Amino acid sequence: MGQNLALNLANKGWKVVVWNRTVPGKEENVVEHFIANRAKGKGIIGSNELTDFVEALKTPRVILLMVQAGPAVDELTGKLFPLMEKGDILIDGGNSYYEDTERRVKELYDKGMYFVGCGISGGEEGALHGASIMPGGAQEAWSVIQPMLKSIAAKAEDGTPCCEWVGPGGAGHYVKMVHNGIEYGDMQLIAETYFAMKHLLALKNEQMADIFEQWDKGRLHSYLIEITSAILRHKEEGGDYLLYNILDAAGQKGTGRWSVINSLQLNTPLGVIAEAVFARNLSAEKNLRVLMSKHYMHVENHPVYNYQDTVIGLESTLYAARLTGYAQGFALMCTASEQYGWKLNLSTIALLWRAGCIIRSAFLNDIAEAYHRAPGLSHLLLDEHFGREVTEALPAWKKYIGVMLREGLPVPVLSAALNYFLGLTTNRSPANMIQAMRDYFGAHTFERVDSPRGEFFHEHWEDNY
């Protein structure tokens, strides 16, 4: 990804100097190989020594780090500190944890230098041809790096670069973290829909690919829906569909988990993303699942449901569930913005995700418009447009979640989205029983419906016996 970013920058006319660490037996002659092959004729300068690398850059220097999140960032930053001067800018383009970025911003600022935590989404292709870029940190750096970053960003259909200043401190990496959390949920929702389609309709790969391709022409249009169709059609050299031969054990790098942990810290429901993380955890328990499937035999002879009704119902179910996942992610960013004082512009963030990134979707324009109309919107599903869309999808959503569960199909994220929506729209929940139990055994007190919020009571429960 670092090589592709360097090529993208060079293609846009920027002077580029590259350096890479040397790890015997693992990373040797990386720079030489890059300069002699992919970067040949691009005017990119290669350097084997960190000192030479820094000296080759004009001041104020702009240094972009593309290293693994965690200690590696601190290690490399520590080596660069003595070589940099006041006014120099250090950009971390990896998936660093936002709290680490907050610390690094302060550390460099105290030395007269500027640190930028920059979320970059789009993978290797996005890095080369245009990514969604989410910079945040030291505001003073923005005027210097703005032309450079916008030149290599993806362009939305209206020509706007998918790059804009997000906010101070760790805001850029935080928004990228939530982006990745939404991505976890989105992928699991699509996977569960494919699974339901396969079992409820007994369809072949090509038939399912046709359905996803058709959906991609409508309100579900998105990068992930597009590649789902392509994946379903992809065959190996022997003629077998590759998907059949891929082990059902999903990997993860941790950004989804970070989103869930932060949601717990901020007391903000994030069930779609949380269940998506747990679903990956469960998928990794392959040996246990094989053992349990033999111990608890499922009846595999599912009845075949009406094709047209089921396809329409699954489309509505997936649409409503995806929208709910995005709504949860934006609600988390809204809470974080208030809690951390970032003043995030949620409309702008939605616009940043319209192209280049993994979760680019047709309805991001509508999300941006919703927050533009009402910047103080407390929840996306309170928007009139999305409220109408979810209301129309609700009957099918409830029906087909019931169908899937009745047929023994595990759909934890599709059902988590529905449960969240039902809970969100329930005026009187069963939480009064929880508060009563907490007060009964622990004297934790409770509020009353006939008293102002913030006034607490305790009952001597055993006096009634």
Model-derived regions, located:
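Glycine-rich adenosine-cofactor-binding loop
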Residues: 1-5, 322, 326-327
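Small-residue-rich helix-loop
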Residues: 214, 337-373
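Rossmann-fold dinucleotide-binding core
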Residues: 73-78, 91, 97-209, 217-241, ...
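Interdomain hinge/lid region at the active-site interface
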Residues: 173, 199, 203, 210, ...
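NAD(P)+-binding Rossmann beta1-loop-alpha1 motif at the extreme N-terminus of oxidoreductases
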Residues: 1-55, 59-61, 83-87, 123-128
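C-terminal amphipathic alpha-helical interaction region
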Residues: 391, 396-465
